Amino acid sequence: NALSFLTDRFLSAVNASEVSGAVFLDLTKAFDLVNHSILLNKLYVYLKDSESLPFFKSYLADRTQRVYLHGSYSYEGKVLCGVPQGSVLGPILFCLYINDLPLHITDKSVQCHMLADDTTIETHSSQFPDLQHSLQTALSDISAWCKHNHMVINPRKSKSMVITTRQKHQISSSSLSLDIEGNKVEQVQSHKLSGLTIDDSLRWQPQIEQLCKRISKNLFLLSRLQSVISFEARK
């Protein structure tokens, strides 16, 4: 899958004595900001079938929402954008909506990996300045795509990372200076992506520690239940 492909690319770069740079992008309320007109135009291009468009148009149009609080309902408000969450079609339509994003990245050394609304860009190089330039160019391209497609990047929740060996981190400066429309992107030593914590030396220590904590917690709960339920049930 996309996550294993991404980590394999990081490992290949480390084995080739290169440095990888990645930016983990956070799209603000991504599912809620999908523009219906743009989505329908993209569906027409992908499906090449105008007969099915009325179905999708009716699926998206005339939706309302209201709030229930303390036994009372608010007035209904029209839903003018976004795809229905909790539905089967919602995530599929969103993936089709952002499917053309990688095509707008002009620097072809930069790869774009998308897992639903988790978008990661990465590249690798033996020269750190080249790494910096490629990632910043890609961020500018993505910002332009987001403006055109009514998406919003949250620079405070977006993170960057330099992935290389621990020895290279110690002997050389590996600090990225990236920004999204003038807002600095924080560089981190580890980041959780789709449940997997990736660290900047690929030693997987943060992931192992988190996994051990979860296992320890579950074992403790099972030990407390040993006097309540049978051994077979605990298995």
Show where each model-derived region lies.
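Conserved pre-catalytic core of RNA-dependent polymerases
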Residues: 1-84
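Short, conserved non-catalytic motifs in the polymerase core
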Residues: 1-4, 22-24, 67-93, 122-128, ...
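Inter-domain linker/hinge segments that demarcate the starts of reverse transcriptase
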Residues: 2-13, 132-149, 216
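Mobile genetic element proteins and their domesticated derivatives, centered on retroelements
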Residues: 6, 26, 43, 56, ...
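Active-site palm subdomain of RNA-directed nucleic acid polymerases
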Residues: 15, 91-126
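Catalytic palm subdomain of template-directed nucleic-acid polymerases
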Residues: 30-46, 119-144
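Short, conserved micro-motifs composed of acidic
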Residues: 71, 152-189
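Basic, alpha-helical interaction scaffolds
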Residues: 182-235
